[in-house]
């Protein structure tokens, strides 16, 4: 880059920084002016020496008027919203739209719990965060946006991951809880704490193109009271096996899908807050959203509280003390989902070791089997690699076991997906298996060896440790990270 180009680049950088600073100042001025107007209105009311003529500020009538004229809300509903205290656990794909609409609706106090920082991979779906806030704590990024949207509400940041020892104290300051998290252990913790402290809970989840929504512990009743709403344990007495739990990072998520579920959480929260106290809440239901189905929504009626529930039945064993002390171990209850070493060190090779061993060699290239699903393989792939999705491998293995297929000598029959070069009993060329993170590839190696493709130890069948994430770090910095 020559001197003129450097000057241009420097000027562009300075202009961008100045424009960003100007935008920040404009936002600060707007918030200050709105706060000044509210302060002026409050001062005028106090100076009058009498009670306010109207329960809301002039600006609040203008701001919330369009929803106050809806019969289901009205002025009483708006006053309930203004006095409500709502806690949102998780400031991600669910928490962002939920917080956005609750703040817009005029909820008086919004608390946000999250210990994560904003990453670029969040931005396609977590709509409160902006590019310039990458690296900033999510709760601070979200509250920054919410204050611009509605300076009349109070926002409380809990800059931490929800932990059992802190959950009861945090929850006690709020009227309603929203579960916007994405892992089973935290879901059970949130539900247990909400039930024990008598807080209604709006819970949602989303993955790929589908989502689920429930309103739990509504109405909130003491343990043993059958008229209370069911809790998360009533619906799911046993957590799913840890190895079946898929995160958005692994399974993917369409932004509007998780956005839809977050908006529905906000809607259900508003319904709970503004409900007539003399009206019985609707029966508990599980609402299932599927973006590529017709109809989009299905509703399943849920049972009432389970008679033997560990939290909300008369025989409850979970208490505030067991939660706070750690006696109720949620990690143990749900199991861990961390990566496992299924193979011995001799059956694994790092990307750097692979490159050193086989790069620029005149001998035949080893076979690389990429076990990512085709949709990921189409994003990026190694030259001359073979795509055999892990789902195909596992499905054929299950089918072979059920059919008892085998050759005359007892060796399992080879599935049709095995490449001819790999299937050949004459070949001893090494076979390496790779995936995104280095977990599925280990499973695939075990299956290949069960099929006898390692020729009784004569052929190397190994996993590339750490998958393509490690490949990017050790071999190819330009490898797409998704």
Swiss-Prot record:
InterPro entries linked: MOCS3/Uba4, Rhodanese-like_dom, Rhodanese-like_dom_sf, ThiF/MoeB/HesA, ThiF_NAD_FAD-bd, Ubiquitin-activating_enz
Associated pathway: tRNA modification; 5-methoxycarbonylmethyl-2-thiouridine-tRNA biosynthesis; Cofactor biosynthesis; molybdopterin biosynthesis
Pfam family name, one: Rhodanese
MF (Gene Ontology): AMPylase activity; ATP binding; identical protein binding; metal ion binding; molybdopterin-synthase adenylyltransferase activity; molybdopterin-synthase sulfurtransferase activity; thiosulfate-cyanide sulfurtransferase activity; URM1 activating enzyme activity
Keyword field contains Glycoprotein: no
EC number(s) recorded for this UniProt protein: 2.7.7.80, 2.8.1.11
Residues reported to bind Zn(2+): 231, 234, 309, 312
Domain Rhodanese: 362-480
Alphabetical UniProt keywords: ATP-binding, Cytoplasm, Metal-binding, Molybdenum cofactor biosynthesis, Multifunctional enzyme, Nucleotide-binding, Nucleotidyltransferase, Transferase, tRNA processing, Ubl conjugation pathway, Zinc
UniProt catalytic activity: [molybdopterin-synthase sulfur-carrier protein]-C-terminal Gly-Gly + ATP + H(+) = [molybdopterin-synthase sulfur-carrier protein]-C-terminal Gly-Gly-AMP + diphosphate; [molybdopterin-synthase sulfur-carrier protein]-C-terminal Gly-Gly-AMP + S-sulfanyl-L-cysteinyl-[cysteine desulfurase] + AH2 = [molybdopterin-synthase sulfur-carrier protein]-C-terminal-Gly-aminoethanethioate + L-cysteinyl-[cysteine desulfurase] + A + AMP + 2 H(+)
Family membership noted in the UniProt record: In the N-terminal section; belongs to the HesA/MoeB/ThiF family. UBA4 subfamily.
Enzyme class at the top of the EC tree: transferase
Protein name per its UniProtKB record: Adenylyltransferase and sulfurtransferase uba4
Localization terms from the record: Cytoplasm, Cytosol
GO CC list: cytosol
Record CDD domains: ThiF_MoeB_HesA_family
Gene expressing this chain: uba4
Presence of the UniProt keyword Transport in the record: no
HAMAP family given in the database record: MOCS3_Uba4
């Amino acid at each position: 880059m020559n001197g003129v180009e450097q000057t241009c680049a420097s000027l562009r950088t300075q202009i961008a920084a100045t424009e960003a600073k100007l935008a920040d100042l404009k936002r600060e001025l707007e918030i200050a002016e709105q706060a000044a107007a509210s302060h002026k209105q409050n001062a005028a009311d106090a100076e009058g020496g009498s009670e306010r003529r109207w329960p809301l500020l002039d600006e609040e009538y203008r701001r919330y008027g369009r929803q106050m004229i809806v019969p289901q809300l009205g002025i009483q509903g708006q006053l309930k919203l203004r006095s409500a205290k709502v806690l949102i656990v998780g400031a991600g794909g669910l928490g962002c739209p939920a917080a956005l609409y609750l703040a817009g609706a005029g909820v008086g106090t919004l608390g946000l719990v999250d210990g994560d920082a904003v990453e670029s991979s969040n931005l396609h779906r977590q709509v409160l965060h902006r590019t310039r806030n990458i690296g900033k704590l999510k709760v601070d990024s979200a509250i920054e946006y919410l204050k611009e949207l509605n300076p009349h509400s109070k926002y409380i940041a809990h800059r931490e991951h929800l932990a059992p020892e802190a959950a009861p104290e945090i929850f006690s300051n709020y009227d309603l809880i929203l579960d916007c998290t994405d892992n089973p252990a935290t879901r059970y913790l949130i539900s247990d704490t909400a039930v024990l402290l008598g807080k209604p809970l709006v819970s949602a989840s989303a993955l790929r193109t589908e989502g689920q929504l429930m309103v739990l512990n509504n109405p909130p009743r003491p343990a043993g009271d059958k008229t209370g709403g069911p809790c998360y344990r009533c619906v799911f007495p046993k957590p799913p096996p840890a190895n079946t739990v898929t995160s958005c990072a692994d399974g993917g998520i369409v932004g509007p899908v998780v956005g839809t579920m977050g908006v529905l959480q906000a809607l259900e929260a508003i319904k709970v807050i503004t409900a007539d106290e003399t009206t019985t809440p609707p029966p508990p239901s599980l609402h299932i959203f599927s973006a590529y189905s017709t109809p989009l929504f299905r509703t399943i009626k849920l049972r009432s509280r389970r008679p033997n529930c560990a939290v909300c039945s008369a025989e409850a064993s979970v208490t505030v003390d067991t939660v706070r002390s750690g006696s109720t171990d949620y990690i143990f209850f749900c199991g861990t989902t961390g990566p496992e070493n299924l193979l011995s060190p001799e059956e694994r090779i790092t990307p750097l070791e692979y490159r050193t061993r086989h790069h620029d060699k005149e001998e035949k290239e080893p076979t690389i089997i990429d076990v990512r699903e085709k949709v990921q393989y189409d994003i990026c792939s190694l030259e001359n690699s073979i795509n055999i999705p892990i789902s195909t491998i596992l499905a054929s293995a299950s089918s072979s076991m059920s059919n008892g297929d085998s050759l005359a000598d007892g060796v399992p029959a080879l599935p049709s997906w095995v490449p001819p070069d790999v299937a050949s009993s004459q070949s001893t060329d090494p076979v390496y298996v790779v995936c995104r993170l280095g977990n599925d590839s280990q499973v695939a190696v075990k299956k290949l060896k069960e099929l006898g493709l390692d020729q009784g130890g004569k052929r190397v069948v190994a996993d590339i440790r750490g998958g393509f994430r490690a490949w990017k770090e050790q071999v190819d910095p330009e490898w797409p990270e998704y």
